[in-house]
């Protein structure tokens, strides 16, 4: 009886010792990992933070005479509200981009364009450094197979289109068999996509450009590589506003 109790006690003590050893080893491993993380920047997911907001652009209806018809809705430089920016248009029919409004928010609409079109914003006082954790944030809507791509114009004049695409979730309209896209807010990243040269006159995609220098970008914007489909819920895109989070570089 006594020997049995002694055996049980010794077994329990052995198990307790093993458990304590496991805890000590786990704590030691955690401390080693913590020390290595603090000493080795390779353990960090990112070595930088997202740059602050450099500029924001919301559109406005340009001045016009007469009724606000389709012709008077056409975009002009006066559609910009940010005095630090310049408007640049690309494509044979880019002048037919229009300033419209949905739910009280102005947006740019390309439903009447008969060619692919692109639009960029140029900061008058600075190049944009789009390396690292730079972001472009925007509110957009697409209809019927249309998608938006980000574009940049480098300091050397090369116009590039990125491989990222942006399209809206489509929902059925109430009481109709037609679908329409939702306005969504999304972010463009620049260090994780492929880049292709974009013909500034025809707005067609050319050859891929490997490792472009995004540290000095002259213009930033978007392109729709399809012509517009007209009024209603035909193929088109809307862009309500654009925010750019990037570092400024002296021109």
Named regions from a protein language model:
Residues 7, 16-17, 46-47:
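Compositionally biased, low-complexity segments
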Residues 33-251:
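Beta-rich carbohydrate-recognition modules and glycan-binding surfaces
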Residues 10-12, 27, 136:
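Short, amphipathic alpha-helical segments
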Residues 16-31:
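Bacterial N-terminal signal peptides
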Residues 1-14:
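N-terminal secretory signal peptides that target proteins for export/translocation
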């Amino acid at each position: 009886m006594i020997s049995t109790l002694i055996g049980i006690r010794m077994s329990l003590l052995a198990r307790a010792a093993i458990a304590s050893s496991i805890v000590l080893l786990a704590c030691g491993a955690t401390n080693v990992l913590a020390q290595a993380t603090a000493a080795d920047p390779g353990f960090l997911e990112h070595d930088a933070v997202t740059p602050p907001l450099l500029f924001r652009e919301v559109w406005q209806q340009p001045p016009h005479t007469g009724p606000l018809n389709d012709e008077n809705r056409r975009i002009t430089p006066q559609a910009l509200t940010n005095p630090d920016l310049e408007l640049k248009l690309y494509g044979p029919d880019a002048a037919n981009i229009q300033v419209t409004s949905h739910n009280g928010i102005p947006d740019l609409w390309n439903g009447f364009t008969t060619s692919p079109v692109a639009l960029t914003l140029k900061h008058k006082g600075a190049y944009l450094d789009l390396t690292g954790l730079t972001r472009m944030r925007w509110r957009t809507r697409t209809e019927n197979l249309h998608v938006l791509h980000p574009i940049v114009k480098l300091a050397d004049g090369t116009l590039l289109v990125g491989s990222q695409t942006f399209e809206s979730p489509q929902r059925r309209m109430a009481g109709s068999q037609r679908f329409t896209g939702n306005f969504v807010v999304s972010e463009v990243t620049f260090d994780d996509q492929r880049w292709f040269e974009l013909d500034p006159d025809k707005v067609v995609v050319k050859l891929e450009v490997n490792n472009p220098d995004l540290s000095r970008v002259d213009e930033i914007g978007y392109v729709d590589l399809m012509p517009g489909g007209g009024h209603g819920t035909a193929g088109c895109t809307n862009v309500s506003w654009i925010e750019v989070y990037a570092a400024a570089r002296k021109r």
